[in-house]
């Protein structure tokens, strides 16, 4: 019953407001904490490390324009328009989540005894159903073949996510750190099977049935 973001198991909880997330502000996100120390630090870093509070300054302000930069931050400020956009969606959040849950369970029922299987969710956990990810378990097929087939049918599928060790940045890091071998069997297996289907609260039954029927045809 604990609220998501309550930081019961963490010092800071971060939410993404990317356009494909349940609540969006166009881009950006929010960080939650119960720590006054972390909260003050994040507020400082979000605006170039600049302060205007006289009590925290090292110098003597010579006018109301005076400010001091006491840390190296960046411009992480969210605009008022973005905040208003996100705030306007809060009243519909429960509906968003319930619709995603409804559609996810509908998908689950349709994929019994097929060449794919949904990701399992433990009964004591609660998902916001941001993504609907399934696994291709048919040994005669793979997720990339299914991806290409559905993509050609105009269905917005995706592969989430590429293992980070495959990315050039981390490969360079591995060379620099003299890391020659990694145990990546689970990541590689997941990446070879996972496929993300469209999931949105305003999808229609017709859309869902179109997707499922195309998958049936693929495995037939």
What do the predicted segments below correspond to?
Residues 26-28, 50:
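Acyl-thioester C-C bond-transforming condensing/cleaving domain
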